[in-house]
Amino acid sequence: WEGAKVAKGRDRWAAVVREASKQSVRPWLPDVLDLVTTKQLARLASTDQAEGVRMLVLEPTAATPLSALDFDRRDLVLVVGPEGGITPQELDALSAAGADIVRLGDEVLRTSTAGPAALGAAHLHSGTGGARRARRRARPLVMRETLSWYP
């Protein structure tokens, strides 16, 4: 994305986050930040891993299913690629930086639904159930050209 399309996409995601937060009765509104490159995202993965944050990259061909991970209540960074997938080079860079490459299940979901489905699955498997927690440092939900901060 370039130029006006960046601002339009960011505004769209900000509206989605705002409405989803209202609907789920969140006590705070996550931030929607600027786009990042794969290189910047890999740096974020490396930094986050050092800080005890886990980055998950959804990839339909990954050997490890999301449900097989041990969720230890760390903050998560979730990366969802575009329709057509994340390139092998991007997967290699993110994996080398410490990200876990996982698949959501046997079915391939659209980009717009894969992120929310993965967040719900991660929430379920983390053992937090429906418990509400105090605001923690916001972490990004990444959809290739879009970076939205999410807890």
What are the functions of these language-model segments?
Residues 2, 33, 58, 83, ...:
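Glycine- and other small-residue-rich loops at beta-strand/loop junctions that grip anionic moieties
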Residues 36-43, 63-65, 108-109:
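A short acidic, often aromatic-flanked loop/helix-cap motif at beta-alpha or helix-coil junctions
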Residues 55-91, 100-102:
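Active-site/ligand-binding-proximal alpha/beta "capping" segment
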Residues 5, 70-73, 92-94, 117:
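Short, glycine/charged-enriched secondary-structure capping and boundary segments
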Residues 1-56:
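RNA substrate-binding interface of SAM-dependent RNA methyltransferases
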Residues 88-150:
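Structured adenosyl-cofactor binding patch, chiefly the S-adenosyl-L-methionine
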